Amino acid sequence: QFAMKVPGIEAIYTWEDVPQERFTMAGQTYPELSPYDRQILDQHVRYVGDPVAIVAGENEKCVDQALKMLRVEYEVLPANLDPRKAMDKDTPLVHPEDNWKALCNIGADNKKNLCATEETHEGDVDAVLADCDVVVEHTYHTKANQQAMMETFRTYCFIDEYGRLNVVSSTQIVFHVRRILSNALCIPKSKIRVSKPRIGGGFGAKQSSISEVYPAFVTWMTKKPSKIIFSREESQIASSPRHEMQVTVRVGANKNGKIRAIDVYTLSNTGAYG
């Protein structure tokens, strides 16, 4: 209530003010392979930087002042930080909610901390490896990688003369963003128009919806124009990096060097959301 009294503040929203439907921010063709595991704002935050409120005001100065006046009380829950232990019996669930859903049958199971799982094989690899003269096995680790495009995430929204929500965004996926916003805001796609000007780089980072949902919600609620511009740090925190991987490879060969079998097991640290 103190933050709302800051001159120029238009609105402050928390998880109680937004639709409770879950959606995915992944820029994928419908039905998406990524699970519907996000909300615009969620009571259960899952990483440092997960949004807890939307503050809208006339200028950046008043918004920054209001942000400093917000007080958030956190109940600290047991963390799940090691992907190698993520499926253990007593490991905390990242998504315990009942309205989590996966549209495609790709082995996703939120009650097991699984975003996806798949197995494919040709022949009996274990039997062939057991019959090989030489078997080499090694486990490799790759770190998470994050893009650093010149232009950070940013979105501008307004309501046009037809009552449509217009979204102008630095994105690579205008039609996917339209569907994502429709799911997040619970409004028809026909009420949304997404435009993409020339963008200052993406490299795949802008193939997910990152910044669009927050000003879109503000504009849809207030019917006033809004925009958001992420800082470099915010862009690094909020977007989806290439996942950390643990890859175990077994290669079997004859003494003459002919490779007879290859077995690969990959564990991907997907993180807080799919």
What is each stretch, according to the model?
Residues 1-107, 135-138:
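Flexible, low-hydrophobicity surface segments
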Residues 1-15, 53-74, 155-222, 268:
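Alpha-helical support elements that line or immediately flank enzyme active sites
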Residues 11-16, 47, 136-140, 167-169, ...:
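General beta-strand structural signal in soluble alpha/beta enzymes
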Residues 17-21, 142, 174-175, 199-200, ...:
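Short acidic loop-to-helix transition motifs that present clustered carboxylates
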Residues 20, 35, 62-88, 115-119, ...:
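Gly/Pro-rich active-site capping loops and adjacent beta-alpha segments
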Residues 21-26, 86-91, 145-150, 202-206, ...:
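Short, solvent-exposed polar/charged micro-motifs at secondary-structure junctions
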Residues 32-63, 203-255:
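Glycine-rich and small/hydrophobic secondary-structure elements
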Residues 94-185:
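Helix-loop-helix junctions that connect adjacent transmembrane helices in secondary transporters/permeases
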